[in-house]
A protein has these predicted regions:
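Carbohydrate-active catalytic/glycan-binding domains of CAZyme proteins
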Residues: 1-325
């Protein structure tokens, strides 16, 4: 996607959504303003910078935040019942002493070009928050659970809480619903969708380094229990089984796969075209060996996918190794 929008654009942590024949992606901007750029496309090949969600310092104050903090992983959704766009985003204030101090907000607009509502505070329960608009009008917010105690997995589980648009606040406290589809650990970037009576949860696992991957689970009830896809991970740069739940190293260079051009593949979201085609956008990197320096930083790739007869999402070639072309 960087090649499509221009190399001077930072396109990562992509959340992709469709309204009619229009495709939109929203991305992280960290400590930079204007915040949360939105790109637009008609064919998912040619993209242009369309608008920014956050343009006013009164909406979000990033002045004193250090590098790489600020706005993380916005989740762009469109609610058909309300004809409204929603963006859920987190502001990471600090990561000192392994304590992730994040505040999560939601912002709403009739037109994706704005004007956008004032941010509504959701919670500070964990980063990478996202929202599902259910068929019955209820709204669910999922995020990861960050554990600070020694000896506990960090992140630990995916949690969910209901959001009331009438009260403009969450209802109750987040509850754990999913502990991942692999043992790679570092579960994050949850996205809930609904299809054919199933709730699907898509997550990143393995950390943002070389053991990164995309996993899925599903359940008939939004609260679970969720069953993992039997072929998890569904997209990765390093196929195979590994146990890394207690490893604090997110980079994990030992998992570098020389057979793959795209490394660190994970943190994805999918979109379906009006004709039923399915595409997944995900994080990746292209390091130079042997130093494994990623001079272009984290990038975004796109994979063609398909739904199986059993109702699971697969890469179009039935593999799970992320492809460059």
């Amino acid at each position: 996607l960087e090649a499509a929008v221009g190399a001077d654009h930072l396109v990562l942590d992509v959340s992709c959504r469709r309204k009619g024949d229009d495709y939109y992606i929203a991305v992280s901007t960290f400590e930079w303003m204007p915040g949360i750029p939105v790109y637009h496309s008609k064919d998912m090949k040619n993209w242009e910078l369309y608008t920014h969600v956050l343009t006013d310092d009164e909406e979000v104050d990033l002045k004193k935040l250090p590098s790489a903090k600020g706005i993380w992983a916005p989740c762009l959704t469109y609610c058909e019942q309300e004809d409204l766009f929603y963006v859920v985003y987190g502001v990471m204030n600090s990561m000192n002493a392994r304590y992730f101090d994040v505040d999560n907000f939601v912002i709403i607009a009739k037109d994706i070009r704005g004007p956008w509502s004032k941010p509504v505070y959701l919670h500070s329960a964990g980063f990478d928050a996202s929202m599902l608009h259910d068929d019955d009008g209820r709204k669910w917010v999922v995020s990861l659970e960050w554990e600070t105690r020694e000896g506990y997995e960090k992140p630990g589980a995916i949690c969910m809480v209901e959001y009331s648009p009438e009260k403009k606040e969450v209802i109750g406290y987040p509850k754990r619903i999913w502990n991942g589809g692999t043992d790679r650990g570092c579960i994050e970037a949850p996205h809930l969708t609904k299809r054919n009576g199933y709730y699907y949860i898509m997550c990143a696992e393995g950390g943002t380094g070389y053991n990164h991957c995309v996993t899925m689970g599903r359940a008939k009830n939004v609260w679970g229990p969720y069953e993992g896809d039997p072929t998890n991970p569904i997209v990765t740069s390093v196929p195979g089984v590994s146990y890394e739940r207690q490893d604090p190293d997110h980079l994990k260079p030992k998992y570098y796969n020389p057979e793959s051009v795209l490394q660190k593949s994970g943190h994805g979201s999918y979109v379906e075209t009006p004709l039923g085609e399915v595409y997944l956008v995900h994080l990746c990197a292209r390091p130079f060996a042997p130093e494994l320096r990623c001079t272009l930083g984290r990038e975004t790739a796109i994979q063609k996918m398909k739904w199986t007869e059993e109702g699971w999402l697969r890469m179009y070639d039935d593999d799970n190794l992320a492809k460059e072309y």
